[in-house]
Every structure is written in structure tokens, then in C-alpha cells.
Amino acid sequence: MEIVGCRAEENTCPFRPPAMLFHGISGGHIQGIMEEMERRSKTESRLAKGGQMNGRETNMPPMSPEKPALCAGCGGKISDRYYLLAVDKQWHLRCLKCCECKLALESELTCFAKDGSIYCKEDYYRRFSVQRCARCHLGISASEMVMRARESVYHLSCFTCTTCNKTLTTGDHFGMKDNLVYCRAHFESLLQGEYPPQLSYTELAAKSGGLALPYFNGTGTVQKGRPRKRKSPALGVDIVNYNSGCNENEADHMDRDQQPYPPSQKTKRMATSFKHHQLRTMKSYFAINHNPDAKDLKQLAQKTGLTKRVLQVWFQNARAKFRRNLLRQENGGVDKADGTSLPAPPSADSGALTPPGTATTLTDLTNPTITVVTSVTSNLDSHEPGSPSQTTLTNLF
């Protein structure tokens, strides 16, 4: 689309020499000079117009008085000095408009034609775009940023929770069911309302046709399971693993029992993988407090990104391992399972005890610049890093 110059009057010359004072020149010479200047100006103007028309002859043939151009919009003759050339047709400046929104396209950089109709960029992509948003079902332009979930594509503003309309950004956990997007909280509520609470993650997968309803955070979810015999079935806790992409050789695993369904089947224990910074944070806090309360669990959940239930189960298992280790030390310091000798329990004067009520600083290992001050109660012992009891605790994990 371009603006092309049309006709110009050739019978008049716009150049008029200014009044000048000629000294020592007769009147006849002055008249000859003025006629020569006027002739040269006419020649230059004709050459300039001829060059301009020849430069655009590939786009539009020069107009002639015998065959005036017709506007493709209104069908009238074009007698204006300037007109528009779009899709190999001539248009009045006022006639080139979008057929949908009637937007004037004379100042736009682009316009689109489809089946003889003219569209602006927004209406063309809205009506004829190949990819459409899975939420609003409108077209998505090629230069627009999108969010992808499985095979669906969404506008950034349309990638929201179906229940609460919360905008989901990169890194947020979300769930999908029936091609609908849910935030983490409402997806958990949806699962709890649809399936009985005693069903484990394995039974949920079987009930859903072999494919469970996991959470998504941009990468695949890593989960491991192994059969294990138990003397008596116990009601277990099924926790969805939110930590994806973990290397099983570089991570610790937490085993959880599951209730069998139906009762004739063997029980299975699922394993949750932890990342290094999560383990360091939990172990550091376990050295200070073996039984954190709800407030401490909330702070740890914010640091590690784990749920409070996951943290509760981990601390419960850690306390059980710690008690078993103390019993083994009291029975002779030899582990009957593998025959390895364990360090002896520390003496009363082996480490310096922290006075009651002393504030102990716990550094967030995930972000070294953040420091959390926790008050240690009088019934807990805080040992120095070099004490034997600290070495014993490290060997547990």
C-alpha cells in the first residue's frame, strides 16, 4: 500500500523570478534572460515528473485523461492529487477501510485482503488465524506471546484458573482436567471431591484409565514406586510429588505407606524425591528442633517449596531413625542389620549446651542472604558442629 501522486497542471509554471535590478543591461537583453530562465524551469519540472512516474511504472501505469482511474471502494473516479494503491487496485484515501471495524487504513502499515474484502491486522487474525486460544477461542497472532499446556495454547491473559480466575505465570503449579486449567489449591479440592480420601495415587491412576492427574510445572513429574510386604496394613498418606527433574542418585527418598485397595492386593510404598537444598534446610532445622510446630512448618514450607504434610512426614521419619540409632548405641553400638559400628553417644561434657532461651540463627540455605532467627527451647540441645552427636546425626541420612 502506497500513496501515489496523480496529475499536475502543465500549462502553468509555478516559478516566477523575483524582481531584480539590472545595471548596464538593455531592456531587450533583460527580456531574453527572463524567457530563458522560464523555459529552463519548465523543462526541469517535466523531467522531474517523468522520472517520478517511471519509478512507479511497475506498480501502477501512469494515468491518462482518456482513461481515469476508478476507486475500488466506492467505484467513483479518482480526481484527487493523491490516491492509495493496495492489492493492485486504486483507492480514495477515505475509501480504504476495514470491512469489519471500519478502521481507516490510510495511515496503517499493513492491510489484509480475503475474498475481495479488506481487513485490518486485528480482525484478520481474529477471523482467519490458524491457532486459536483454548480459553477464549480467538485467533493468536504470530508475534504474540502464549502459554502452552499439553496440546493447548492460551493467551497470557487467558491462562487462568477456571474456578478463581487467578492468572498463572511461569513456574506456578497447575492441574488440568477435561482441558480446563486449575490452580494448585482448586485442583486439590477437585481431586478430594471426586475420589474417596482412602484411595492412593496408584488407585487414582487406575481409576482414571491408567493415567493419573498430576500437577504440572513445565517439566515431567518424577515418581518412583516399589512393592514392599508389611505385617499389617496401615492407613497411609499419599502425597503428590511436586519436585520434578530430580536425580535419584543425588536425592534422598521418603517412603510412605498406602492402604491396599482392594484388600487382597499387596501394599505399595511411594517415594518422594527431595532436592539438595531442601534436604540441607530440613536437616539443619532438625539439628535444632526435632518436632517443629505449625509456625515452623509454614516457614520451612516457604523456604523449601514443599507442603506442610510432606515436612511433617519427613520429620516423623527422621525422629524415628534418630530414636532407633540411640537404641542401637545403647545395645552395644553395633547395627545388627549390616554389622557396621555406630559412634558412641556423646558424654555430658562433650559439647557446649546452649542456654535456655538463647536465640539461634538458622540460615536459609536456598538463599544465603536471608537469615531466620529461631528461639530454641530449654529442653533441646544445640551441639557444636564438631561434636560427636552432630556426626551421628549426619550418618542417619
Curated annotation (Swiss-Prot):
**Organism per entry:** Gallus gallus
What are the GO MF terms of this UniProt record?
Answer: DNA-binding transcription factor activity, RNA polymerase II-specific; metal ion binding; RNA polymerase II transcription regulatory region sequence-specific DNA binding
CDD domains of this UniProt entry? Answer: homeodomain (cd00086), LIM1_Lhx2 (cd09469), LIM2_Lhx2_Lhx9 (cd09377)
User: What does this gene product do?
Assistant: May be involved in gonadal development.
Question: Encoded by which gene?
Answer: LHX9
GO CC annotations, alphabetized: nucleus
Answer whether the UniProt record assigns the keyword Zinc to this protein. yes
User: Which PROSITE patterns does UniProt cross-reference here?
Assistant: HOMEOBOX_1 (PS00027), HOMEOBOX_2 (PS50071), LIM_DOMAIN_1 (PS00478), LIM_DOMAIN_2 (PS50023)
Query: What is the protein name for this chain?
Result: LIM/homeobox protein Lhx9
Q: Got any disulfides in this one, which pairs? A: none
Per its UniProt record, what InterPro entries does this chain match? HD, Homeobox_CS, Homeodomain-like_sf, LIM_Homeobox_TF, Znf_LIM
SMART domains per record: HOX (SM00389), LIM (SM00132)
